[in-house]
């Protein structure tokens, strides 16, 4: 049926901030939906609170509202815009839950807004555990024995009847939030309690556990006519029991028989038909590996993380097709953009293997519980495409960027002596490290059957891993052979003998190298096994023409000719990435993406990569992208002229450069991932565009940067380097406390601490770092002043500063975890001018061509530089959106030779707007048990939101509400702070009391507050009698927790338990007094009943331009 003609304006709900369980895949889905509707001439209104997304660009929708994803704000937008329809299925679980609230409130009926795509009754059939169970029973689809409950006692009674273990699945949550596997009653009590609290309707499903069965997913599409197709089937390498977001996933399924595949495919089509889904749908099955028995585990009646993976794996644009269906089209009326010939009714066919590997945040959280279960813990994922499983697996591993370029280095040298018992013990645990223990077990010649019995991983996958290990063994034997034949034991002679061997004896060794490359082994991995250098391995390959070809993703296994330049590498194959007949390399530029989403490197860098490509297209350049993240907009085949789905690893990038011969490579916009590649690529002859590699080094090398600051007359906090604990103490005495300490060999704020006393320093040096001449520790003065952040653009001569951001938390909290307001409110004119002057001097002094990010601290009236990043930063999307200045486009054009004057921009600091914008961090602590929620120099947030308004307090309120703070004006506040913070906390406590909240405090804090004349109820510590602090939190008597801590003291351990209890009970826990003050400001705004207006970003910017 044709498109509906009654839809003139449609509202799309986005998914909000990046959190574990809901990442950047919804930015990809939302941008596709916006594009589809605008192509059809429909006016698009978008609401999303995440400024880092591409979907919130003003050119993506006619009206963009950066407002909290809360029912009251959506209602205000509906009242103002009067849309004809609403699409909620592109906003993940957040979108679905909001749609349900809007339907139940009657607001959609009142304003005659149609819920487009899947209906609310269909959504409830899939999401409400009770209704879903009944529906499956009605159509004869098997589900595990289960019961829907709303109390812990009900859960216990059911588990007692069916026996342990049981799985808990909350209704209306994302990423398995609140769920888990309970092995006994004690575990069930805790998991069920969390699950009930996490569920939108306080409902959980307790079901019989089928751990060990295969987990298989089907991505299905249906239109209003009832046409259904399966787009992709995917098999989890990990058996049931590990959340699919934390599993290794293969597409297409690798171990199913045709009978099993057809059985599950028919079941999937039957289920989507019964649920009357209109659009995309993900269905998860558990399959008994020993019979044809299966269970339906879950149905997601919306675009999901798996949808993004299936889209990139097949080339079938699921979100785009679902959006077309939502406005009335049927599948046979939608054409396939990849082939340009087939319709969307044509099921994709794959002649390659796709693998997804999860990216976990445990490199940031050493003490976190690494055990995997039904509650997701991965922050992101990578995808790889190969002609065989081994190739795809090793590519995906390289793409993870976890300091393990390949499996050969996955277990440290010390682990060579591991006993078999220890390996078997580790195999029995389901942790993020299980893959490396699997390989270690195979190396130790533990039988595959024994490994299978312990892990339930299919023998097919274990054999593939054994194939990889066999190459290691063959190359190691080759090294021994050549060393025995070499008199001088000389590396060059070994290389010559290796070459000679390859040329002679029927090229046996050359064949081994060729087969190893076909299986995905990197030069690094082969180097580690043979004893040769990477450069030697590379030279041997090139000499014998062992280089990758590039195959095209075409959705149809070559049955139809494809138009889409979307490639992956393969050895010993015909090359399908044929360059244009006319050489155009002087108008061709490669942009490096940012890889998987992780803490410290989020969707902001995908935003930057995409905007760089758009700028190159504006200039008439052919744009190329290398990236490996299936969730992102940058890996949409429509964004760049040619997309390479490859690891961001030196060898893989160099191979693409050799294939495409671009004019240059842009590394500024892919975060630290791309920046780290700049030097090795330049060393190999690539032209790094923008700021030179040597100038990047001047910004990042401590000594060189200090020399520049001295030359420019710019201050920075005093600091020195210690190579021993004794020296650290001497430096500390010289500089004075407090101090910032960090290991010199760790980037990105990892293992950084603020120490306030000699005891703090002793604890840090003992437990946090290994200090030696090879691994020195950097010690700097900690100036707890106002932190200022600037993103600027330089064309080599002039500097544009869109605006100045002021951090709400003082220095000491990582900039990514700080709230930031724009424009800066607390700067006097002299300080502002000095910051602008310093920024211009640094940009010019470092010969920046592109973007520079600078962080300052203003302390006792002086301005100090604390960090300079010669690349795009996390705040670029935020500052670009609220000022209307497209920083990445300006920077890219400057790199390509266009001055600001040529582009029509004036240099200097831009005028301040009349409105305020506040950026707030968002954390995923609830998903990561045993992680301390306290904020410090090491980044912990996974995403961000924005609040905007003409009133700063209201903008602050919106930002805190959007970030997940539950803001209300009743209940109690628990205050327990370190001695150094007691004086500063007093006025905050008085403000809480003025709002009518009851004050609770631990003994030391309570005594101080009483002495100040403040009425406070003292509560026992955790080690004391009951009811204690934890009991009060669990009983709901406390609505806010303010807790600061002291390093290495007993209260820190008490504080950890308090902070965790707050997080696990959904209570705001504030570990910075500045954040507490900001919350109070928001609460006071609410108390005054100030009106909360909504206004589109376009309308704000329109006033700025007038």
Curated annotation (Swiss-Prot):
Its EC number is 6.3.4.16, 6.3.5.5. PROSITE patterns: ATP_GRASP, CPSASE_1, CPSASE_2, MGS. ATP 2 binds at residues 742, 781, 783, 787, 812-815, 855, 867. Mg(2+) 3 binds at residues 855, 867. Mn(2+) 3 binds at residues 855, 867. It is an enzyme of class 6 (ligase). One of its GO terms (molecular function) is ATP binding. It comes from the Bacteria. Pfam families: CPSase_L_D2, CPSase_L_D3, MGS. Keywords: Amino-acid biosynthesis, Arginine biosynthesis, ATP-binding, Ligase, Magnesium, Manganese, Metal-binding, Nucleotide-binding, Pyrimidine biosynthesis, Repeat. Pathway: Amino-acid biosynthesis; L-arginine biosynthesis; carbamoyl phosphate from bicarbonate: step 1/1; Pyrimidine metabolism; UMP biosynthesis via de novo pathway; (S)-dihydroorotate from bicarbonate: step 1/3. Mg(2+) 1 binds at residues 284, 298. Mg(2+) 4 binds at residues 867, 869. CDD domains: MGS_CPS_II (cd01424). Binds 4 Mg(2+) or Mn(2+) ions per subunit. Residues 578-964 are annotated as: Carbamoyl phosphate synthetic domain. Residues 402-577 are annotated as: Oligomerization domain. Residues 965-1106 form the MGS-like domain. Residues 1-401 are annotated as: Carboxyphosphate synthetic domain. Large subunit of the glutamine-dependent carbamoyl phosphate synthetase (CPSase). CPSase catalyzes the formation of carbamoyl phosphate from the ammonia moiety of glutamine, carbonate, and phosphate donated by ATP, constituting the first step of 2 biosynthetic pathways, one leading to arginine and/or urea and the other to pyrimidine nucleotides. The large subunit is composed of 2 ATP-grasp domains that are involved in binding the 2 ATP molecules needed for carbamoyl phosphate synthesis. The N-terminal ATP-grasp domain (referred to as the carboxyphosphate synthetic component) catalyzes the ATP-dependent phosphorylation of hydrogencarbonate to carboxyphosphate and the subsequent nucleophilic attack by ammonia to form a carbamate intermediate. Belongs to the CarB family. PANTHER family: CARBAMOYL-PHOSPHATE SYNTHASE [AMMONIA], MITOCHONDRIAL, CARBAMOYLTRANSFERASE FAMILY MEMBER. This is Carbamoyl phosphate synthase large chain.
């Amino acid at each position: 049926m044709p498109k509906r003609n009654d839809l003139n304006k449609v509202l799309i709900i986005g998914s909000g901030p990046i959190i574990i369980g809901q990442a950047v895949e919804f930015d990809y889905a939302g941008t596709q939906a916006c594009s589809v509707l605008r192509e059809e001439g429909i006016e698009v209104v978008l609401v999303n609170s995440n400024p880092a997304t591409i979907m919130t660009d003003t050119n993506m929708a006619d009206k963009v509202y950066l407002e909290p994803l809360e029912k009251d704000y959506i209602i205000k937008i509906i009242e103002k815009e009067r849309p004809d329809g609403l699409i909620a299925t592109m906003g993940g679980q957040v979108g679905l839950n909001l749609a349900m609230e809007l339907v139940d409130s009657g607001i959609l009926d009142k304003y005659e807004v149609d819920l487009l795509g899947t209906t609310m009754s269909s959504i409830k059939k899939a999401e409400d555990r009770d209704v879903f169970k009944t529906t499956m029973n009605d159509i004869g689809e098997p589900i595990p024995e289960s019961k829907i409950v709303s109390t812990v006692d009900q859960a216990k009674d059911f588990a007692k009847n069916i026996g342990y273990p049981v799985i808990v699945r909350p209704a209306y949550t994302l990423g398995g939030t609140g769920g888990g596997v309970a092995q006994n009653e004690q575990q069930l009590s805790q998991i069920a309690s969390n699950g009930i609290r996490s569920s939108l309707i306080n409902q959980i499903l307790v079901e019989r556990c089928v751990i060990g069965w295969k987990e298989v997913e089907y991505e299905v599409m249906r239109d209003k006519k009832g046409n259904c197709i399966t787009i992709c089937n995917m098999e989890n390498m990990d058996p049931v029991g590990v959340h699919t977001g934390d599993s290794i996933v293969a597409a297409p399924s690798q171990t199913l028989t045709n009978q099993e595949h057809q059985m599950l495919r028919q079941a999937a089509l039957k289920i989507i038909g019964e649920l009357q889904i209109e659009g995309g749908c993900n269905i998860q099955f558990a399959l008994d590996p020993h019979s044809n028995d299966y269970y339906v585990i879950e149905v997601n009646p919306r675009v999901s993380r798996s949808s993004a993976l299936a889209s990139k794996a097949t080339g079938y644009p699921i979100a785009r097709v679902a959006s077309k269906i939502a406005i009335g089209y049927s599948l046979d009326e939608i054409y396939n953009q990849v082939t340009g010939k087939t319709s969307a009714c044509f099921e994709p066919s794959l002649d390659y293997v796709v693998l997804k590997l999860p990216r976990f945040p445990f490199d940031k959280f050493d003490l976190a519980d690494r055990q995997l279960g039904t509650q997701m813990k991965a922050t992101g994922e990578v995808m790889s495409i190969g002609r065989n499983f081994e190739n795809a697996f090793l590519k995906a591993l390289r793409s993870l960027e976890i300091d393990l370029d390949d499996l050969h280095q996955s277990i440290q040298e010390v682990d060579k002596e591991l006993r078999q018992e220890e390996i078997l013990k580790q195999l029995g645990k389901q942790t993020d490290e299980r893959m490396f223990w699997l390989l270690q077990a195979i190396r130790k010649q533990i039988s595959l059957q024994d490994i299978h019995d312990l892990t339930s991983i299919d023998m097919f996958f274990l054999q593939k891993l054994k194939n990889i290990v066999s190459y290691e063994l063959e190359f190691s034997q080759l090294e021994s052979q050549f060393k025995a034949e070499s008199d001088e034991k000389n590396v060059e002679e070994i290389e010559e003998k290796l070459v000679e061997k390859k040329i002679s004896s029927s090229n046996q060794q050359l064949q081994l190298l060729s087969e190893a490359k076909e299986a995905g082994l990197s030069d690094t991995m082969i180097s580690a096994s043979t004893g040769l250098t990477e450069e030697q391995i590379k030279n041997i390959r090139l000499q014998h023409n062992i280089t990758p070809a590039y195959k095209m993703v075409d959705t149809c296994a070559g049955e139809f000719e494809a138009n889409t330049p979307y490639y992956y590498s393969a050895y010993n194959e015909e090359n399908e990435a044929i360059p244009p007949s006319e050489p155009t390399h002087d108008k061709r530029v490669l942009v490096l993406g940012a890889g998987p989403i992780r803490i410290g490197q989020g969707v902001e860098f995908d935003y930057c990569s995409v905007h760089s490509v758009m700028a190159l297209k504006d200039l008439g350049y052919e744009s190329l992208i290398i990236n490996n993240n299936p969730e992102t907009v940058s890996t949409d085949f429509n964004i760049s002229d040619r997309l390479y789905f490859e690891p961001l690893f030196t060898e893989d990038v160099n191979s693409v450069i050799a294939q495409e011969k671009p004019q240059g490579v842009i590394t500024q916009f892919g975060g630290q991932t791309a920046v780290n590649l700049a030097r090795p690529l330049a060393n190999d002859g690539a032209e790094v565009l923008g700021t030179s590699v040597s100038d990047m080094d001047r910004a990042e090398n401590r000594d060189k940067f200090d020399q520049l600051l001295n030359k420019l007359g710019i201050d920075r906090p005093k600091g020195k380097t210690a190579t021993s604990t004794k020296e650290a103490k001497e430096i500390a005495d010289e500089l004075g406390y407090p101090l910032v300490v960090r290991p010199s060999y760790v980037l990105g704020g990892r293992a950084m601490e603020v120490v306030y006393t000699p005891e703090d320093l002793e604890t840090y040096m003992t437990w946090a770092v290994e200090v030696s001449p090879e691994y020195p520790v950097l010690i700097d003065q900690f100036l707890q002043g106002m932190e200022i952040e600037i993103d600027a653009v330089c064309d080599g001569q002039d500097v544009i500063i869109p605006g100045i951001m002021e951090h709400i938390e003082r220095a000491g909290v990582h900039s990514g975890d700080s709230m930031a307001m724009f424009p800066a409110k607390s700067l006097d004119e002299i300080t502002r001018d000095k910051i602008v002057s310093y920024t211009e001097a640094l940009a010019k002094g470092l010969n920046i061509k592109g973007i520079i990010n600078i962080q300052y601290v203003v302390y006792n009236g002086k301005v100090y530089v604390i960090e300079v990043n010669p690349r795009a930063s996390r705040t670029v999307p935020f500052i670009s959106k609220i000022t209307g200045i497209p920083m990445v486009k300006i920077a890219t054009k400057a790199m390509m030779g266009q001055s600001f004057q040529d582009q029509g921009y004036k240099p200097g600091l831009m005028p301040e707007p009349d409105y305020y914008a506040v950026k707030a961090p968002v954390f995923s602590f609830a998903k990561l048990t045993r992680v301390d929620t306290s904020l410090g120099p090491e980044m912990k947030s996974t995403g961000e939101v924005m609040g905007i308004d003409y009133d700063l307090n209201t903008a602050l309120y919106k930002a805190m509400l959007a970030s997940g703070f539950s803001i209300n004006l009743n209940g109690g506040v628990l205050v327990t702070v370190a001695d150094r913070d007691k004086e500063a906390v007093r006025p905050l406590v008085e403000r809480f009391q003025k709002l009518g909240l009851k004050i609770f405090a631990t003994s030391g804090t309570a005594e101080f507050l009483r002495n100040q004349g403040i009425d406070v109820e003292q509560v026992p510590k955790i080690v004391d009698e009951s009811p204690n602090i934890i009991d009060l939190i669990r009983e709901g008597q406390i609505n806010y927790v303010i807790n600061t801590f002291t390093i290495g003291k007993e209260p820190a351990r008490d504080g950890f338990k308090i902070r965790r209890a707050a997080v696990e009970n959904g209570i705001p826990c504030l570990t910075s007094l500045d954040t507490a003050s900001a919350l109070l400001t928001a609460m006071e705004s609410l108390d005054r009943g100030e009106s909360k207006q909504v206004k589109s970003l376009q309308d704000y910017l329109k006033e700025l331009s007038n």
